UniProtKB/Swiss-Prot annotation:
Gene Ontology terms, MF aspect: ribosome binding; RNA binding; translation initiation factor activity
Protein name: Translation initiation factor IF-3
Organism: Escherichia coli (strain K12)
Keywords: Cleavage on pair of basic residues, Cytoplasm, Initiation factor, Methylation, Phosphoprotein, Protein biosynthesis, RNA-binding
Superkingdom per UniProt: Bacteria
Gene3D superfamilies recorded: Translation initiation factor 3 (IF-3), C-terminal domain, Translation initiation factor 3 (IF-3), N-terminal domain
Residues marked Important for 30S binding (site): Y107, K110
PANTHER family tied to this protein: TRANSLATION INITIATION FACTOR IF-3, TRANSLATION INITIATION FACTOR IF-3, MITOCHONDRIAL
Matches recorded under InterPro entries: T_IF-3_C_sf, T_IF-3_N_sf, Translation_initiation_fac3_CS, Translation_initiation_fac_3, Translation_initiation_fac_3_C, Translation_initiation_fac_3_N
Outcome (variant: Y107 to F/L): Reduced ribosome binding
Subunit details: Monomer. Component of the 30S ribosomal translation pre-initiation complex which assembles on the 30S ribosome in the order IF-2 and IF-3, IF-1 and N-formylmethionyl-tRNA(fMet); mRNA recruitment can occur at any time during PIC assembly.
Length: 180
């Protein structure tokens, strides 16, 4: 639908004519304090500078207003929030499955994967699954988990270590050590 009415989105800050207070505490373009002035005087100063008068904290007594370019202010705000989102890392739990009879070659490949996960800052979940008669040899499973724990002790801390078997599997969770 072309040419329709555009819905005005609510701004987080009131600007220029939207400010309702009679007197405001005014801050200049460079952040300098200009004192408490009337709203009309503040609007005139903003117009002289060719920018907007923006209400920063409406709940203060009197409300704090700043002379600034509102478009630039919104751009800087969104840019900084995007930067913050980039810096946040979602910690994932990566799972590697072992068996009591996992051979040396397979063990080394899985160990390299675990090292990569921990270096990337992710947690690692080691699942040791027993099948058939392997259930009778649970100590072999514990030896495998202890070996993994010992091999990764410089990189990781054990978050949970199995004390008993759950169903047909044992689960150990490793978290990466904090970097100094």
């Amino acid at each position: 639908m072309k040419g329709g009415k555009r819905v005005q989105t609510a701004r987080p800050n009131r600007i220029n004519g939207e400010i309702r207070a009679q007197e405001v505490r005014l801050t200049g373009l460079e952040g300098e304090q200009l004192g408490i002035v009337s709203l009309r005087e503040a609007l005139e100063k903003a117009e002289e500078a060719g920018v907007d008068l923006v209400e920063i904290s409406p709940n203060a007594e009197p409300p704090v207003c700043r002379i600034m370019d509102y478009g630039k202010f919104l751009y800087e705000k969104s840019k900084s929030s995007k930067e913050q989102k980039k810096k946040q890392k979602v910690i994932q739990v990566k799972e590697i499955k072992f068996r009591p009879g996992t051979d040396e070659g397979d063990y080394q490949v899985k160990l390299r994967s675990l090292i990569r996960f921990l270096e990337e800052g992710d947690k690692a979940k080691i699942t040791l699954r027993f099948r058939g008669r392997e259930m009778a040899h649970q100590q072999i499973g514990m030896e495998v988990l202890n070996r993994v724990k010992d091999d990764l002790q410089e990189l990781a801390v054990v978050e949970s270590f199995p004390t008993k078997i759950e169903g047909r599997q044992m689960i150990m969770v490793l978290a990466p050590k904090k970097k100094q």
